[in-house]
């Protein structure tokens, strides 16, 4: 699953993502290798601690981040939060939380983009496009699997932000601006 809907009201949409089963399986597998190396080796205690610590470090490095997106119409902001256990351990608990705050009115479009995932094929992610020309992914990593899960989240965000309804009046005003003046407008 790409992201789970935590809460959904007319003014607030809260999406969450936690590390998936692949990520946890990789953590257990790498950590088990370190524990097995320490248990079955005849090395000193220092080396055994090195095996376990090294494998724990590599395992946590490969763990996906916890991510959440909060769209709030009352404040007019989107808050994208990321929590990384690896950064938290690496900086000795000083960092690990990243946060991006964007105004809702700056979001022009929501797209699904395809990204190559090394060794595994294709992954998909939702990208927010802003009026300034910049774009920002909803999550930091692409999800492998079905594109339909990611498209469902993109449609949910689009309907919550009413992006397609906002385009219709502007299209009408552009078409009325391009129409030739009537008989009263000519001199």
Curated annotation (Swiss-Prot):
The keyword Lyase does not apply. Pfam families: Cybc1_Eros (PF15169). The chain crosses the membrane at residues 20-42. Keywords: Chaperone, Endoplasmic reticulum, Immunity, Innate immunity, Membrane, Phosphoprotein, Transmembrane, Transmembrane helix. Disruption phenotype: Mutants are highly susceptible to Salmonella and Listeria infection and are impaired in their ability to control replication of either pathogen. Mutant neutrophiles have a highly impaired superoxide burst. Mice are very susceptible to Listeria monocytogenes and die within 5 days of infection, fail to form neutrophil extracellular traps but are resistant to melanoma metastasis. It comes from the Eukaryota. GO terms for cellular component: endoplasmic reticulum; endoplasmic reticulum membrane. It is a single-pass membrane protein. One of its GO terms (biological process) is innate immune response. Coiled coil: none annotated. This is Cytochrome b-245 chaperone 1. The lineage of its organism: Eukaryota, Metazoa, Chordata, Craniata, Vertebrata. The gene is Cybc1.
């Amino acid at each position: 699953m790409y992201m789970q809907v935590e809460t959904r009201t007319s003014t607030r949409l809260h999406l969450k993502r936690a590390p998936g089963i692949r990520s946890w399986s990789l953590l257990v597998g790498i950590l088990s290798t370190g524990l097995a190396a320490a248990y079955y080796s005849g090395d000193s205690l220092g080396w055994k601690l090195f095996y376990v610590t090294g494998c724990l470090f590599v395992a946590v490095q490969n763990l996906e981040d916890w991510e959440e997106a909060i769209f709030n119409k009352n404040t007019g902001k989107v808050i994208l939060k990321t929590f990384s256990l690896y950064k938290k351990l690496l900086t000795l608990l000083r960092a690990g939380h990243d946060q991006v705050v964007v105004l809702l009115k700056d979001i022009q479009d929501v797209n699904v983009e395809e990204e190559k995932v090394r060794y595994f094929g294709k992954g998909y992610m939702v990208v927010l496009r802003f009026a300034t020309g910049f774009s920002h992914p909803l999550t930091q990593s692409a999800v492998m699997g079905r594109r339909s899960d990611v498209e469902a989240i993109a449609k949910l965000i689009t309907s919550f932000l009413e992006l397609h309804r906002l385009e219709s009046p502007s299209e009408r005003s552009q078409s009325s601006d391009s129409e030739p003046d009537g008989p009263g407008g000519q001199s």
